[in-house]
Structure formats: C-alpha cells, structure tokens
Amino acid sequence: MTTRTPILAIAALLALSCGSAHAALFPVTGAITVNGNSGDLPAGTFGNSSYDPATGQLSSGSFVFPQSSVTVPVTGLGNVTVIYQLSQNAPSSAQVASDGVAAMTPVAMTLSVLWIAIPLPIATEPCHFSPINLELDGTGAASGLDLEDRAFTVPQTTDPCGGFASQINAALVGNSNSITVHLAGDFTPPAGDTDKIFVDGFDG
C-alpha cells in the first residue's frame, strides 16, 4: 500500500458522502390523457436523485406514484371507475442544456389496473399494460423541470383482468395519449453553449 492509498480512499468516501447528501425526492405533479380520457396525475415523486447545475445533469431516479382513479367509458359497462397505479420499470436520468432545453432518457412505465367499480368494486389483478414507453422532453428552469410526451402508445394486455380484459383493452389501448409532468425544484440551466442533449443522443 502506498502513502497515496489512504488519501485516495478518503477522497472517494468524501465524494460519495457529498453525492448522497444532495440526493432528493423531487415532488411531481402533472396530467395524463389515455385514449382521449384526461385527468390529473396523483402527486408523486422522482428520485432519489440529484441535479448538478454546473453540468445540467439530473442523476438516475424513478417516478413513483400512488394509486389513483379515473372514470372512463367501457363498452358494455358504461362509465366505469378505474383504480390504477403507474410504476416505472427501470431508472432514468435527464439533461438540461444551457438554453434550457431538457430531455429525459427513455422512461418505461407499467400501468396496473387494480380494481374497477361498476358500481361495486371488482378486483382485476393481474391487469398490467407494459411497457408504456415515454419520450419526455421540455424545459428546465429555476421554477422546475417541465416535461411532456404528446403521443405515447398503451399496448394491449394479455392478463385476464378479472374477466374484463377485452373491455379494458378497448377502453385503454391506443395512441391517443399524452402526459405532462412537473418536477418541483431548481433546475437552472448550466452556463455555456453546448447542447448536451443532442451530443448525448437523449433526443433520439
């Protein structure tokens, strides 16, 4: 062991402790439209993650949302209250360029339909729609990170969904979908004139 080894080890530990100290859960709000039916997203979080204003990098994290409900028309059943939950399949990160343009690496989500009420609640698990691939881009500023995907696809489920798979597929599957998310926090763009999003290929 050289005399530099302890110094390097201490430096590495300090770097790790500093990085973890800045990790946070960023509050998330937004709205979602699925097959033409719109509603607010339940208040969620993105993290544990940290934003570096010097580079514009938002470190790897995941969206977490609680259960929520939406009323949708279902063929043969009328207006049905759907209790659902969105979950992220794998972490993603984001980049804010010096001009404020922002993009997140591809986000794969799962939409789980937990119950439907017509009007009595009926359990539908398992009933998963995945992957729902989101390409989120937008802007970063001191007031927050605003991202959207104006046209994503909900794939069909092959789960039984409590015997209502065909009706739920008809109600949810398609391309007439959009999502907006707002991450609360200071996402001031970095100084400089390099658009890192296009250099790193986040926009592809």
PLM features: residue spans?
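Ser/Thr-rich, Pro/Gly/Ala-heavy low-complexity intrinsically disordered linkers and tails
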Residues: 199-203
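Sec/Tat signal peptide C-region and signal peptidase I cleavage site
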Residues: 18-23
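Extracytosolic secretory-pathway proteins
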Residues: 24-195
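Bacterial N-terminal signal peptides that target proteins for export
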Residues: 1-8
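Bacterial N-terminal signal peptides
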Residues: 9-17
